[in-house]
């Protein structure tokens, strides 16, 4: 079984913030494949189902971003999921808006949610899907930017970006990380270089 985990923050006020892109991708997969992500388990909302013939668990840790590992590690242990079948999906301020980068391993690169996951699993060999959110112009505070609502003018691009990311995650489960990297490590089609 795959564990497809989107990182984010619980609460309506964060629902459409850049920091919650991971949650939005999990929601898109849930919608596409009729999986209800409503069951509480190990400080996460989870849903079990099938994507393209593969058993999956979709998860949205409810611990707040910086404690994500506190939810995912017990969840994996309880359900006996191999770490090679974990895919973590999250926002990345180091990448431009609309860029997607799949990596099979590596550091957290300053992302506190991923840092927590690496600390709990005691390995950096974790597949991750990084979703670029940098607006292409200087920002005063990264912390404020990632928690503020995404602009209404960006909603169409957001929808396309989330769909592109969901397809990337599907490809990881169906065809493997290498093929997914070849197909999806780029900007989502139809997105502008600058913030709208």
Swiss-Prot record:
Domain of life of the native organism: Bacteria
Pfam families per the UniProt record, alphabetical: Pept_tRNA_hydro
SUPFAM superfamilies hit by this protein: Peptidyl-tRNA hydrolase-like
Main EC class the enzyme belongs to: hydrolase
GO molecular function, one term: tRNA binding
S-S bonds: none
Catalytic activity: an N-acyl-L-alpha-aminoacyl-tRNA + H2O = an N-acyl-L-amino acid + a tRNA + H(+)
GO biological process: protein quality control for misfolded or incompletely synthesized proteins; rescue of stalled ribosome
EC number(s) reported in the record: 3.1.1.29
Active site (catalytic residues): 19
Site (Stabilizes the basic form of H active site to accept a proton): residue numbering on this chain: 91
Residues binding tRNA: 14, 64, 66, 112
One cellular-component annotation, GO: cytoplasm
Alphabetic keyword roster: Cytoplasm, Hydrolase, RNA-binding, tRNA-binding
Subunit (UniProt): Monomer.
Family, similarity comment: Belongs to the PTH family.
Function: Hydrolyzes ribosome-free peptidyl-tRNAs (with 1 or more amino acids incorporated), which drop off the ribosome during protein synthesis, or as a result of ribosome stalling. Catalyzes the release of premature peptidyl moieties from peptidyl-tRNA molecules trapped in stalled 50S ribosomal subunits, and thus maintains levels of free tRNAs and 50S ribosomes.
Protein name per its UniProtKB record: Peptidyl-tRNA hydrolase
Organism for this UniProt entry: Solibacter usitatus (strain Ellin6076)
Primary gene name: pth
